[in-house]
Regions:
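Conserved single-residue anchors adjacent to enzymatic active/cofactor-binding motifs
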Residues: 1-208, 294
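Short, charged alpha-helical interaction segments and adjacent helix-coil junctions
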Residues: 2-8, 12, 76-81, 167, ...
Length: 294
């Protein structure tokens, strides 16, 4: 199970704290989005202050809190990713996570009776404390393009930006560089990061935020316990099934040995024990017995 961070120890690199800071200070949020997009944003409006796909964290661990729009109606979702989550199958989940976010936000934008041409431009921003593609870039920007001609863009107005806090190169502004350094070190280095740090402490002194975090952690623990117990039950069931199968196989081998000693024909042993010819021949060889064909 995941270790729990105390509320007073939360840093900006924690997703809960990051979202609380972005939601509670419009000016900081606007400046950060503008620095990532490398454009001046005059104003932002919070579309949903708590767009939770299922109460708190579901099995995917997804909680969409910071959804906003600028003066041009472009929508943004801000997310802090402190872990590169890998599935049991060994697949990194971040790319599929972006697809899931897009589908949920798009469905939310499409009101009943409206056409799909009402979809506003969407930018999904993931600030990561790890370099997902290991190329050292500050920002990886993705749009849909034609593989046969990369100059052709599928103009679906969806952009995904993976912002790498460990980045070393790329054309980004100083404000973003300093913010990413602050994310990794927790040490403010300019006026902007000092303002962010002050807002972090303001959140820590907010009783409501503390209560929300405690409820969130309780929900996460509950989910982990249920998942653990389900895994235990599945393990017991699997072990029981394997044990029964092994018992039946052992009984078949013992029966085959007795029949081999009585020089019963191979076809009869095969039919009686459901063992293959290869298994019976190998068993006979292991026990120094003769196989009677027929």
């Amino acid at each position: 199970m995941m270790s729990e961070t105390k509320f007073e120890d939360l840093k900006i690199s924690n997703d809960f704290m990051f979202k609380e800071v972005m939601k509670s200070n419009k000016g900081l949020c606007k400046r950060l989005v503008g620095s990532i997009m490398q454009q001046d944003i005059e104003d932002i409006v919070y579309i949903e202050t708590e767009k939770t796909l299922q109460p708190y964290y579901d099995s995917r661990g997804i909680r969409l809190d910071v959804i906003l729009a600028d003066e041009n109606h472009t929508r943004y979702n801000l997310e802090m990713q402190a872990r590169n989550v890998i599935s049991k199958a060994g697949v990194a989940l971040l790319p599929k996570r972006t697809r899931y976010y897009q589908s949920v936000i798009d469905m939310d934008m499409l009101k009943q009776g409206e056409n799909f041409d009402q979809l506003n431009p969407l930018v999904l921003i993931f600030i990561c404390t790890f370099d997902f593609y290991k190329e050292g870039r500050y920002v990886y920007t993705f749009k849909s393009r034609c593989l046969e001609n990369l100059e052709l863009e599928l103009a679906n107005d969806v952009t995904v930006k993976l912002v790498n806090a460990k980045g070393k190169h790329g054309q980004v502004n100083t404000l973003l560089k300093n913010f990413l350094r602050y994310v990794m070190t927790n040490e403010p280095v300019d006026d902007f990061t000092e303002d962010v740090e002050r807002q972090v402490w303001a959140v820590k002194n907010d009783k409501k935020a503390r209560e929300e975090y405690m409820v969130l952690q309780a929900k996460i623990r509950e989910h982990e316990i249920v998942a653990y117990e389900a895994g235990e039950a599945q393990g017991h069931a699997t072990g029981l099934a394997e044990g029964l199968a092994e018992g039946e196989a052992k009984k078949s081998r013992e029966t085959a040995i007795k029949m081999l000693k009585k020089q019963k024909p191979l076809s009869e042993i095969k039919e009686f024990t459901d063992m293959s010819e290869e298994e019976i021949v190998r068993l006979a060889k292991e026990n120094g017995l003769e196989v009677i064909n027929g």
